[in-house]
């Protein structure tokens, strides 16, 4: 265990939308420290979403992120020699982090040609409440629902 809780690091807002959430998303999208490439992928994807849906691209992205973020998850807790999957509520910062991670990972595994297309496709489908990332969220919720009996083993 660490001695003290680490100080929270605050991110600078992104240049185009001046939103710290976008910066966080781009940071998880980035490979090998190539932030400018990650920014161009994200901005192009948002523009593509705007073109396809004729709504604000950033709003569609935020809606998609809310649809993908889990409310509850299961955590392993060892009680007397057996391990239980205990459903717990997800903290707001972790909720967003998981949503971003899932959105990016499932966008990467899509079939389109470029990452911009993949990300735009996943954002659009997630905002409609479908797609692989939303399915992952539902699986996590289903797992928590199935293990509701162990919710008295709080952390």
Swiss-Prot record:
Superkingdom, taxonomy of origin: Bacteria
PROSITE patterns registered for this protein in UniProt: RIBOSOMAL_S7
Gene name of the encoded protein: rpsG
Organism: Cytophaga hutchinsonii (strain ATCC 33406 / DSM 1761 / CIP 103989 / NBRC 15051 / NCIMB 9469 / D465)
Listed GO biological process terms: translation
One example GO MF annotation: structural constituent of ribosome
Keyword list, A-Z: Ribonucleoprotein, Ribosomal protein, RNA-binding, rRNA-binding, tRNA-binding
Cellular component GO terms held in the UniProt record: small ribosomal subunit
Quaternary structure, from the entry: Part of the 30S ribosomal subunit. Contacts proteins S9 and S11.
Official protein name in the record: Small ribosomal subunit protein uS7
InterPro entries: Ribosomal_uS7 (IPR000235), Ribosomal_uS7_bac/org-type (IPR005717), Ribosomal_uS7_CS (IPR020606), Ribosomal_uS7_dom (IPR023798), Ribosomal_uS7_dom_sf (IPR036823)
Pfam families: Ribosomal_S7
């Amino acid at each position: 265990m660490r001695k003290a809780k680490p100080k929270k690091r605050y991110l600078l807002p992104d240049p185009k939308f001046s939103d710290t959430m976008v910066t966080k998303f781009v940071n998880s999208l980035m490979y090998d420290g190539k932030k400018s490439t990650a920014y161009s992928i994200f901005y192009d994807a948002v523009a593509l979403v705007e073109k396809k849906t004729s709504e604000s691209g950033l709003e569609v992205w935020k809606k998609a992120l809310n649809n993908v973020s889990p409310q509850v998850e299961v955590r392993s807790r060892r009680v007397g020699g057996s391990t239980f999957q205990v459903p717990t509520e997800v903290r707001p910062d972790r909720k967003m982090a998981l949503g971003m991670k899932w959105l990016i990972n499932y966008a990467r595994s899509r079939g389109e040609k470029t990452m911009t297309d993949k990300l735009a496709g996943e954002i659009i489908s997630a905002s409609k409440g479908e797609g692989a990332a939303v399915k992952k969220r539902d699986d996590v919720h289903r797992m928590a629902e199935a293990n509701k009996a162990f919710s008295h083993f709080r952390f």
